[in-house]
């Protein structure tokens, strides 16, 4: 016997010995399937040719009989039957529909078990279980539809007839015989001994000498239990083989050697064709008396208590199934409509999605989550991929259908693994070094230390090991608990009384939220790519501006509709949509229009927090849940209008409910917050604004939301998360643009991306675009084309890159960052790390930064993960009154007090006596003192009494304040151990604090009674002033006192306070003689005289205020306030004001302002109070930090040692020769601190050629204030001056200044006059002097001040700089010099910080006259719309309502069309505009008649338009002249304009660029040697602009000169000459075409006026460039008047510089915004439009 093992993967490949005894598995099939045409695989044919077909198939059937015995044998294709194409076969009628490419493919390449003449494998597997009732009647082969009648079987012929009628066999000879068709030798088979199964198996095991792989495989433990030898070759599993049926013939005269049908070949489809004549056989089953195998083996149903698993009611096991699915401990997964993969099943199980799947609703469920959520975790099993050999090997033969009737003996299966399988099956291989050989480990094992190099497996599984360990511990705990609970001797059912395990439900979010389609697609309407600063300031609080109601007029009707018709239309549309989809629930929120407040049920939720941590955008969904905690099992459920009821033992909030309480909450993926229903007022309503209409609805249900519990962390500014989000947002936007492109390949433009992300650098955008696209330039068009090798992510992948929750977190961060910037916090404060409690670092995080959402969300989520606790001091409390949680993280460890005396552990802290020696009588007395009852004391033993005393004493000691020493007597006398708070105590205290805040918040927010707001403090201003004074005093005290001891500092503070007290006393009482007389009084005593003086002082103050305001102190002011009461009625309240200042303010405001201003001013008061409150908090925080720093410094400061007085060194003679370059003094350098100009701008040395400037230098340096005179200390400026001496010095210098100023001005005037006379040719001296004066004054760096001396000083300085150096050379010098920039700030205040300011220069740019005219016409149109009855002319006439209008009116027009023409700048003349207005009037007359009200309205509009035109006629005339210069009265302007157009057309000639500018003399120096008079188009264009052409001949002469110059230099045949000739011919042609107009203008030109203008221009011309620039920068008064005449209107000029809002202090506090909002004028509206950015969200269709 061959013991060699072949790789068969556990399946036999050789023929078993008892194969002759096996039965064909398809032999017992009924005749219905044996004779079925489909079973024989025959085509539909008549009965005549059926026999031929069967005879023709006979050889194949015989051949397949041999192959059927070896079913499942892994054979090769060359060993199989040759493949026949279906197109060449007669039994394949449907081969024509097969694709030609598939005709030659053998299916056995993929499925070795396939045979065209055999039933398919899948059909054979299920053929055994086909019921009789499931059989299908096939009618396609019959001619009639009548029921088939069972045919009588023909009588069996005699044997002799069969033998005589036997047909001759036809041999089928095959050249290459397959191995499967070869049979064993008959002689060899006959020589084999006949052994029983047991003897044959024992013989195999004895002969075996090789250990088979299956013996040491995974089933080794079972084979060992069977005591099977290691060298066994076979296994007897105890199964019984099925006995072959004995078939006996009915006829008795059968010969013995007669061949039965069993000896004939048969197929799996039925018996052989020639077996039909034989008689039917009767199957005889041997009824054996042997015991069945099933009696010895326990079946699964006998072991499992299957009765308990029968589900009678699905609702009873619903919760149990949901809990099992939520835990995710199942070994398998259930594919559903939403869980098509195992990953989605795990994600759905973790998010409780099965509850929505089983609720019976057909609403679609969105299971799209982050990638990390659907990744499998180690707690869930992963199914390996199915082996590929399942399709090849006959695994179905090893299925045990009946252990007592096995078709064959089962052989052991070899467990083999393939390297293509999952590597987790056989583990990760050990990593080895590259320098190690096969035997290297044995020789050098002792030289290597453990952990010298890290395995890759450790690197891969390093992060997973910790999670696996935690899960194993949890599993072990649950297993032990299960073993304990399932004790068989535990008959008390303790598992029903064990409390449910509590878990942190806040840490995970198991909601399944489906947002609307616009929100899921990140629509730009709701998710802007870059919100503006204005929008971030009013995030989710868009103000109701006057721009929305600007068209509302007091006496005009404004139509407001109810949305009933809209609701009916939407309901009908959605019902039709629902019916079209088959009924059920349909998701309607698909478009932006569906997110409207005009339909469906509305709920209004107001957040109690001023700035919620995070808010969802419009279109995002939330859920309302109602939590209820039952008192007992039969407690009734509360009813709620909104939300779904949830019975929970523990609610997901910081506090818990008491039995019988309920709480509503709003939950989504971002946050969770409790909500409280409030009553709505009957007088309130909801006003909804759409694009063109207003709607009104009853006020919906109103809820108040409590403090949010964030579930999503907000990223920090400029953090990695925020940066990655912006990057992904940019990528998603780019991919969307590519998807939206219809071109091939897809493309986009750079401007689309840059406009969406203006804050992103263009280089970064290009960097992102280069990753997926290439830059293409096609003519003037440029775009980015998608790379052909780049796979564009699908739309689902793009949506997963940026989710709505990510956008909301980013917006929350940006809004908070903007608020902090407005409050004065820079970016350097955003990343200040939190300071540990025990750290000595003084850098602490600001309170405002602690309240930022990125810090609060991080702290809250960390507290839910039990990483920290939340602060209980209320720094980040949003309520400000202790009714909210402060989301600031605090360490879990108890606070260590350094000053506290350490208490030894396990010692008696309060007494030296030992409790064990305490007498019993005294112990009982102590218990009585604690309040223990006498009967309880009598029932206790001695040691129990001692334990009570120790416990009560320890609790009393812990109840004391931190840091106090425990008293020896009292409750804490016998305190035991360390009384400091432990972690458990901290946790308990924290839990009680959270519960108290939670209950207090619920009680406050659930209160529906109105709360009065009249109790606010009115002393906020005085408190702020007091805090400011205290802060200044503290800053002054701390300045320069870092190295002073505490005693000296206290002494200085006392002296300062005493001095201030004495000064205040003198101010109140005046000069007294008490100090001179030496009278003393006790400290703190107040005399009657002082009281009288104080009261007199208060009366004096009141009288002074009354004198100023004109109101006596006894007058009172009554204010009657009318407001709405709770019931909607008007209620009048009376308020009495007694303060004169308030009375005067109320009176002045009422007399000078209107009601609108007062209303806006009252609304602004709340904002003012809020700003004051924030300022007060910042001052308090600063004072607190300063006190803390002082306390820290007090422990470190030591007494200063007395400084030894060092002798003054004699001056160095070498230094005496050194001269300072800053102050020009000797003995030091400019970097020395002794220099008086140290840290300032150095003086610039003057040239000595001008005597006046030299003298002025000395005067200016002498007039500077001494450096020691002005000093800055903290926030105060100290002046140490002697005013008497300074005044004398100023008087002396004033005379000298006047004299020098006159001398310098005279000298400058003489030089300028000489210069003008030399070059100007007799220009007027006054203009030159004025220009020179203007230039001198404008050259100063400091501008003009209020002091006359300073004015003269600035003029003289400017003169000196004009003559000798650059402007500002004397005063100020170079303000950006390296000396002043490199030095640190000096304590001295520079003089120019107070005397000079920045010079603002406004450069006015000329506006487009078409734009100005359009704006003026728009104003007129808007005024026309205000006329009563003008609504009929605003829009075109509706042809459906007025059918015959367009038949009568051929030229219709409306104000809408007129406004469209204005926006397109189609009106260039006034006449065109008035003609359209008149056309509108004529159309109304023609259709409506002269006396119709619409015609009268059109007449009023025409009259008003003409009136406005007449009022601004001069401005319109000026604009028309600027638009079309031909309309100007000066013909020279029109003439020059036409010539300029001709020059432009000459420039447009192709390849004429060489003649546009002059020839460069550096490149072509020989040009100007030949050409003496050069000419080009730029010179001609300049002449036409300057109106130098007076005739046509001059113009043509210059054009011809370009051609002649080219001929002279290049030659007549040159290309350039031909191009110049073409230009000249073009000029002649254009002049000829416009000869009539040009000739008329030339004749109308006045030559005398031209000559005068030319002479005046030549007289003013100057050759000096410097003086020309000076004259241009400072025009004279006459030139300014001429400019004003040319401008014609101030509206045509736009200030390019404007007012700088960034440098105005009022912008920081919002004063300008408030002033603009309080004004009703049109100018204020324009200013508001300028200051406020464009916000496209104001035009949304809803009230969001």
UniProtKB/Swiss-Prot annotation:
Component of the TFIID basal transcription factor complex, composed of TATA-box-binding protein tbp-1, and a number of TBP-associated factors (TAFs). PROSITE patterns: BROMODOMAIN_1, BROMODOMAIN_2. Disruption phenotype: RNAi-mediated knockdown causes embryonic arrest at the 100-cell stage, premature cell division of E2 cells, Ea and Ep, severe loss of polymerase II large subunit ama-1 phosphorylation and reduction in the transcription of several embryonic genes. This is Transcription initiation factor TFIID subunit 1. The keyword Glycosyltransferase does not apply. The gene is taf-1. InterPro entries: Bromodomain (IPR001487), Bromodomain-like_sf (IPR036427), Bromodomain_CS (IPR018359), TAF1 (IPR040240), TAF1_animal (IPR011177), TAF1_HAT_dom (IPR022591), Znf-CCHC_6 (IPR041670). It is found in: Nucleus. Residues 1372-1381 have a biased composition (Low complexity).
């Amino acid at each position: 016997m061959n013991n060699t093992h072949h790789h068969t993967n556990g399946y036999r490949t050789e023929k078993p010995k008892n194969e002759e005894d096996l039965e064909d598995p398809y032999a017992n099939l009924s005749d219905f399937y044996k004779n079925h045409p489909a079973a024989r695989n025959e085509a539909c044919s008549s009965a005549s040719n059926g026999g031929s077909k069967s005879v023709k198939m006979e050889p194949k059937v015989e051949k397949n009989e041999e192959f059927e015995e070896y079913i499942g044998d892994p054979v090769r294709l060359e060993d199989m039957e040759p493949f026949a194409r279906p197109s060449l076969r007669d039994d394949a009628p449907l081969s024509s529909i097969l694709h030609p490419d598939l005709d030659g493919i053998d299916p056995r390449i993929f499925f070795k078990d396939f045979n065209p003449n055999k039933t398919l494998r899948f059909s054979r597997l299920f053929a055994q279980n086909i019921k009789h009732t499931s059989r299908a009647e096939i009618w396609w082969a019959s001619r009639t539809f009548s029921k088939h009648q069972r045919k009588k079987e023909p009588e069996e012929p005699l044997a002799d007839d069969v033998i005589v009628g036997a047909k001759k066999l036809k041999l089928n000879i095959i050249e290459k015989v397959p191995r499967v068709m070869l049979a064993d030798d008959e002689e060899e088979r006959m020589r084999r001994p006949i052994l029983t199964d047991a003897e044959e198996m024992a013989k195999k095991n004895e002969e075996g000498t090789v250990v088979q792989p299956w013996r040491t495989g995974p089933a080794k433990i079972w084979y060992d239990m069977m005591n099977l030898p290691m060298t066994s070759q076979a296994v007897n599993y105890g199964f019984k083989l099925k006995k072959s049926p004995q078939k006996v013939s009915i006829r008795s005269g059968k010969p013995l050697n007669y061949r039965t049908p069993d000896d004939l070949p048969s197929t799996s489809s039925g018996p052989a064709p020639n077996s039909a004549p034989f008689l039917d056989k009767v199957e005889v089953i041997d009824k054996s008396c042997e015991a069945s195998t099933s009696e010895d083996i326990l079946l699964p149903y006998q072991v499992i208590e299957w009765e308990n698993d029968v589900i009678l009611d699905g609702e009873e096991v619903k919760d149990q199934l949901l809990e099992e699915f939520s835990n995710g401990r199942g070994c398998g997964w259930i594919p559903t409509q939403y869980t098509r993969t195992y990953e989605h099943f795990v994600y759905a199980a973790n998010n409780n999605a099965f509850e929505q799947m089983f609720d019976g609703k057909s609403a679609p469920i969105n299971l799209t989550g982050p990638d990390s959520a659907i990744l499998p975790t180690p707690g869930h099993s992963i199914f390996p991929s199915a082996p590929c050999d399942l399709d090849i090997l006959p695994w179905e033969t090893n299925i045990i259908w009946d252990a007592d009737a096995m078709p064959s003996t089962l052989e052991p299966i070899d467990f083999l693994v393939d390297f293509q399988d999952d590597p987790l099956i056989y583990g990760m291989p050990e990593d080895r070094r590259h320098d190690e050989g096969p035997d290297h480990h044995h020789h050098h094992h002792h030289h290597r230390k453990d952990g010298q190099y890290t395995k890759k497996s450790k690197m891969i599984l390093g992060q997973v090991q910790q999670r696996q360990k935690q899960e194993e511990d949890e599993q072990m705990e649950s297993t032990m608990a299960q073993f304990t609970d399932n004790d068989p001797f535990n008959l008390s059912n303790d598992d029903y009384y064990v409390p449910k395990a509590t878990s942190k439900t806040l840490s995970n979010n198991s909601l399944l939220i489906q947002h609307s389609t616009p929100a899921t697609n990140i629509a730009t309407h709701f998710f802007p790519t870059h919100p503006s600063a204005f929008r971030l300031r009013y995030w989710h609080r868009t103000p109701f501006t006057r721009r929305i109601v600007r068209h509302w007029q007091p006496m005009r009707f404004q139509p407001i509709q109810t949305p009933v018709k809209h609701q009916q239309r939407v309901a009908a549309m959605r019902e039709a949509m629902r019916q079209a989809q088959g009924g059920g629930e349909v998701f309607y929120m698909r478009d932006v229009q569906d997110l409207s407040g005009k339909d469906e049920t509305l709920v209004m939720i107001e957040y109690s927090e001023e700035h919620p941590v995070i808010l969802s955008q419009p279109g995002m969904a939330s859920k309302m849940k109602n939590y209820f905690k039952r008192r007992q099992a039969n407690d009734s459920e509360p009813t709620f209008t909104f939300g779904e009821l949830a019975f929970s033992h523990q609610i997901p909030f910081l506090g818990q409910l008491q039995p019988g309480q309920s709480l509503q909450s709003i939950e989504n993926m971002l946050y969770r917050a409790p909500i409280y229903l409030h009553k709505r007022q009957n007088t309130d309503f909801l006003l909804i604004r759409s694009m063109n209409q207003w709607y009104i609805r009853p006020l919906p249900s109103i809820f108040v939301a409590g403090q949010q519990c964030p579930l999503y962390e907000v990223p920090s500014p400029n953090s990695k998360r925020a940066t990655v989000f912006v990057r992904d947002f940019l990528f998603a936007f780019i991919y969307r643009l590519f998807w939206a492109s219809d071109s091939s390949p897809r493309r986009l433009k750079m401007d689309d991306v840059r406009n969406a992300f203006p804050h992103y650098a263009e280089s970064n955008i290009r960097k992102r675009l280069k990753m997926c696209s290439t830059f293409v330039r096609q003519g003037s068009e440029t775009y980015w084309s998608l790379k052909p090798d780049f796979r564009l992510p699908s739309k689902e992948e793009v949506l997963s890159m940026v989710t709505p929750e990510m956008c909301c977190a980013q917006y929350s961060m940006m809004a908070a960052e903007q608020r902090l910037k407005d409050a004065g916090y820079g970016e350097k404060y955003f990343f200040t790390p939190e300071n540990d409690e025990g750290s000595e670092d003084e850098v602490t995080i600001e309170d405002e930064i602690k309240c930022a959402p990125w810090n609060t969300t991080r702290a809250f989520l960390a507290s839910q993960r039990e990483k920290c606790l939340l602060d209980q001091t209320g720094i980040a409390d949003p309520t400000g009154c202790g009714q909210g949680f402060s989301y600031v993280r605090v360490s879990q460890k108890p606070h260590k007090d350094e000053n506290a005396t350490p208490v030894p552990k396990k010692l008696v802290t309060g007494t030296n006596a030992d409790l064990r020696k305490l007498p019993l009588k005294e112990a009982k007395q102590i218990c009585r003192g604690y309040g223990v009852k006498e009967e309880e004391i009598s029932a206790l033993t001695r040691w129990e009494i001692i334990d009570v005393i120790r416990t009560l004493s320890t609790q009393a000691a812990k109840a004391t304040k931190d840091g106090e020493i425990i008293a020896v007597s009292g409750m804490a006398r016998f305190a035991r151990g360390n009384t400091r708070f432990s972690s458990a105590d901290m946790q308990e205290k924290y839990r009680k604090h959270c519960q108290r805040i939670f209950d207090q918040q619920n009680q406050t927010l659930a209160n529906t009674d109105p709360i009065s707001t009249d109790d606010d403090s009115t002393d906020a201003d005085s408190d702020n002033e007091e805090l400011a004074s205290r802060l200044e005093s503290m800053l002054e005290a701390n300045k320069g006192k870092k190295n002073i001891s505490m005693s000296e500092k206290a002494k200085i503070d006392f002296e300062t306070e005493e001095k201030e007290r004495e000064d205040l006393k003198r101010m109140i009482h005046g000069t007294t003689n008490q100090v001179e007389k030496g009278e003393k009084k006790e400290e703190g005593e107040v005399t009657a005289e002082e009281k009288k003086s104080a009261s007199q002082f208060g009366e004096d103050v009141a009288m002074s205020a009354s004198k100023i305001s004109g109101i006596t102190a006894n007058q009172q002011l009554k204010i009657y306030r009318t407001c709405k009461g709770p019931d909607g009625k008007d209620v009048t309240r009376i308020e009495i004001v007694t303060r004169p200042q308030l009375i005067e303010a109320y009176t002045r405001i009422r007399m000078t302002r209107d009601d609108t201003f007062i209303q806006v001013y009252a609304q602004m008061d709340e904002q003012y109070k809020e700003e004051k409150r924030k300022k007060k908090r910042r001052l308090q925080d600063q004072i607190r930090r300063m006190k803390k720093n002082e306390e820290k410094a007090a422990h470190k400061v030591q007494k200063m040692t007395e400084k030894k007085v060092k002798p003054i060194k004699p001056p160095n003679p070498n230094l005496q020769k050194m001269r300072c370059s800053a102050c020009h003094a000797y003995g030091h350098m400019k970097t020395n601190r002794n220099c008086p100009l140290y840290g300032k701008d150095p003086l610039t040395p003057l040239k000595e050629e001008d005597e006046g400037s030299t003298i002025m230098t000395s005067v200016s340096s002498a007039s500077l204030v001494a450096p020691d005179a002005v000093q800055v200390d903290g926030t105060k400026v100290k002046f140490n001056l002697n005013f008497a001496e300074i005044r004398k010095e100023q008087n002396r210098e004033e005379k000298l200044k006047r004299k020098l100023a006159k001398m310098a001005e005279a000298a400058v005037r003489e030089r300028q006059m000489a210069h003008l006379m030399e070059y100007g040719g007799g220009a007027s001296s006054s203009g030159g002097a004025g220009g020179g004066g203007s230039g001198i004054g404008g050259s100063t760096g400091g501008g003009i001040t209020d002091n006359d001396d300073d004015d003269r000083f600035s003029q003289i300085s400017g003169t000196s700089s004009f003559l000798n150096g650059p402007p500002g050379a004397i005063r100020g010098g170079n303000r950006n010099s390296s000396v002043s920039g490199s030095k640190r700030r000096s304590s001295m205040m520079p003089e120019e910080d107070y005397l000079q300011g920045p010079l603002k220069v406004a450069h006015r740019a000329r506006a487009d006259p078409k734009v100005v005219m359009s704006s003026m016409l728009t104003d007129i149109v808007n005024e026309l719309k205000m006329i009563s009855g003008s609504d009929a002319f605003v829009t075109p006439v509706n042809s459906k309502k007025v059918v015959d209008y367009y038949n009568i009116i051929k030229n219709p027009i409306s104000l809408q069309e007129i406004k469209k023409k204005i926006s397109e700048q189609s009106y260039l003349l006034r006449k065109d505009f008035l003609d359209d207005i008149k056309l509108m009037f004529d159309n109304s007359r023609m259709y409506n008649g002269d006396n119709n009200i619409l015609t009268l309205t059109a007449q009023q509009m025409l009259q008003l338009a003409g009136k406005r035109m007449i009022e601004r006629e001069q401005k319109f005339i000026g604009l028309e002249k600027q638009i079309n210069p031909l309309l100007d009265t000066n013909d020279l302007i029109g003439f020059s304009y036409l010539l300029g157009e001709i020059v432009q057309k000459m420039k447009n000639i192709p390849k004429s660029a060489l003649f546009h500018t002059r020839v460069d003399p550096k490149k072509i120096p020989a040009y100007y040697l030949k050409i003496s008079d050069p000419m080009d188009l730029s010179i001609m264009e300049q002449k036409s602009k300057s109106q130098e052409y007076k005739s046509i001949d001059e113009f043509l002469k210059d054009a011809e000169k370009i051609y002649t110059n080219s001929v002279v230099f290049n030659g007549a045949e040159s290309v350039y000459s031909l191009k110049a000739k073409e230009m000249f011919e073009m000029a002649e042609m254009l002049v000829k075409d416009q000869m009539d107009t040009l000739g008329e203008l030339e004749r109308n030109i006045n030559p005398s006026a031209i000559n005068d203008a030319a002479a005046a221009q030549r007289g003013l011309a100057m050759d000096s460039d410097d003086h020309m620039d000076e004259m241009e920068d400072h025009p004279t008064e006459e030139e300014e008047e001429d400019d004003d005449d040319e401008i014609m209107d101030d509206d045509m000029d736009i200030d390019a510089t404007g007012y700088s809002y960034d440098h105005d202090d009022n912008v920081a506090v919002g004063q300008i915004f408030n002033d603009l909002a309080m004004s009703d004028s049109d100018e204020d509206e324009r200013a508001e439009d300028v200051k406020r950015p464009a916000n496209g969200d104001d035009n949304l269709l809803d009230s969001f």
